[in-house]
Amino acid sequence: MNLLAIDPKPVVAAQRRRRIEDLEQKMLGLDSGAMTQELLNQTKHHFCEGVYAREFFLPKDHACTGRVHKTACFNILLEGKITLAMGSTEEPQTIEAPQFFVSEAGEKKALYAHEDSVFITFHATEVTDEDKMMDLFTVPTVKAFERYRRELLEDKT
């Protein structure tokens, strides 16, 4: 008999990311366009000497998924209580403000607000154009992130 020891973490993380993407597809099928735009319009952008902070409000009993982050970033739940699902965590976690954590590059999050909540991500950059932030720090899907990583590796060779 041949035995092969493998690390199951990448496989399990990929399965969790797929579940988050499946949730996102179901949410996109709902008629929530007006609400989504209203929430995006409430998003606040803050800049200070090489740091960009994106402040996002999520009302009680609402859920959202985020884009895939290209780099690691700081996260703060400033107000409220949420259930947070990420590809890198074993199971969804319910957390209450104030809470701080780091999410790694390639992370995709799903949030559900048990209370009105304020969530902030922090990124290092000198760019101060709000319209460029989303594409500068995120990609829409895990496949796009994998493509982005391949291109980075190709540029280094």
Language model: regions and residue ranges:
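A short, N-terminal "cap"/entry segment at the start of jelly-roll beta-barrel domains
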Residues: 1-55, 85, 145-157
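Conserved short histidine dyad/triad with adjacent acidic residue
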Residues: 51-70, 95
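A generic "binding-loop/recognition-motif" signal
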Residues: 62, 70-71, 107, 115
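Glycine- and acidic-residue-biased ligand/ion/polar-headgroup-sensing regions
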Residues: 69-88
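Structural motif
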Residues: 81, 108, 116-118
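Short acidic-glycine-tyrosine-enriched beta hairpin
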Residues: 86-110
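Double-stranded beta-helix
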Residues: 114-157
